């Protein structure tokens, strides 16, 4: 999403980098982009989906995942969900993926948000420990599960940012973990950084 309805140079850099290591790249935009803007990334993507800005990033991912469908999803070794809220990459992505392939996990993300007993910010009793949604990766075992697709089929298209965080981002990790899937962050220090800094907006 871009409030100016443009694809920035930073976005192009990210998309180009992703295209070099992903077999297929679906670009979903919640912005009203002109064809001249979409042309900037067309050499790098398999498909472009232009939609209204409903549901924020989870609304966009929901539409793309349901469009792909269960049969297509299970063909992939991994599914990466990411947005443009953080610039990437600074270091080669291959190194990150290689290191995480050595870990015995079913899904992972760049950073993790620690458990907080006070969930008033998201209108919940607590905030569960969860992978931050700006970059997450799911393996074939997760993609083939009923719990993964059920989540995307059943989540409403929330209009409010807090509702998205409270009902989607902060809950999805726990839903998958409760189903027996194992997860880990790439940046292990993110368990402690936001607690030490007393800034729970890290890395933003």
PLM features: residue spans?
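ER/Golgi luminal nucleotide-sugar-dependent glycosyltransferases, focusing on the catalytic module
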Residues: 1-204
């Amino acid at each position: 999403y871009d409030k100016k309805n443009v694809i920035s140079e930073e976005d192009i850099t990210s998309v180009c980098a992703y295209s070099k290591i992903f077999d297929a790249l679906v670009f979903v935009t919640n912005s009203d982009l002109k064809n001249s803007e979409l042309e900037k990334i067309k050499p790098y993507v398999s498909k472009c989906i232009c939609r209204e800005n409903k549901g924020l990033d989870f609304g966009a991912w929901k539409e793309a995942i349901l469009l792909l469908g269960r049969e297509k999803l299970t063909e992939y070794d991994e599914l990466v969900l990411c947005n443009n809220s953080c610039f990437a990459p600074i270091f080669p992505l291959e190194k990150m993926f290689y290191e995480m392939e050595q870990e015995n996990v079913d899904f992972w993300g760049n950073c993790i948000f620690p458990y907080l007993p006070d969930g008033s910010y998201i209108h919940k009793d607590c905030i569960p420990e969860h992978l931050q949604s700006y970059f997450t990766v799911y393996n074939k075992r997760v993609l083939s599960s009923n719990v993964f697709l059920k989540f995307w089929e059943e989540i409403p298209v929330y209009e409010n940012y807090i509702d998205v965080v409270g009902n989607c981002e902060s809950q999805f990790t726990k839903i998958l973990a409760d189903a027996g899937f194992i997860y880990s962050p790439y940046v292990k220090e993110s368990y402690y950084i936001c607690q030490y800094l007393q800034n729970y907006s890290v890395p933003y």
